[in-house]
Amino acid sequence: NQMKGGNKMQDLTLILEGGALRSLYTSGVLDVLMKYNIEANYVLGVSAGALTGMNYISKQKERSAKINIENCDNPRYIGMKALKKEGGIIGYDYLFDDLSKNAYPFDYETFKLSKQKFIPVITNCEKGITEYVEKNDCKEDIFKVVQASSSMPLCSKMVKIGNNHYLDGAVTMPIPVDWAIKEGHKKILVLLTKDRDYRKPEISNTMKKVY
């Protein structure tokens, strides 16, 4: 299921919304783009969109969907066992180590060498701002940035990167269209996982007290 040859970089920016397992829809769209060798030059991933976007950059069709479908009842991947062992409802160590090296090998080489700009979106908890980290400019482990982007408040522990702590990019910027426009991007394709009439609610008092 590896995408082979014939790719032409498109003047296209993809914005991938999060949404936990709703990202299966995003996976399907990205698989179709890969099938027809449509290679966007910019890919912004928020939360689960960042996890899904990694497989678009590594050119691995169906990998994202298989991991989520085949492991949705795997307690090491998601659930109380992951929470107890890793401090979060998603077992990121298990995902990036065991699963990505054995059951579902991740093509690190293709990912690393890709000329596409892959930008996970994260929330800086100290400063309360959104940060955009491009993989080739990242001074830290890009997989840690992806983990931070998809670490949901209350369900995950904060991820330390440098001197700051980070959480899900969707906390401050769920759909970074304005950022893309300000950066001069002209052709933007946004993959949404929520209903069209959805509106983000105000931050709860519980969330304010915790963070």
Where are the model-predicted features located?
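Patatin-like phospholipase
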Residues: Q2-V46, M54-Y211
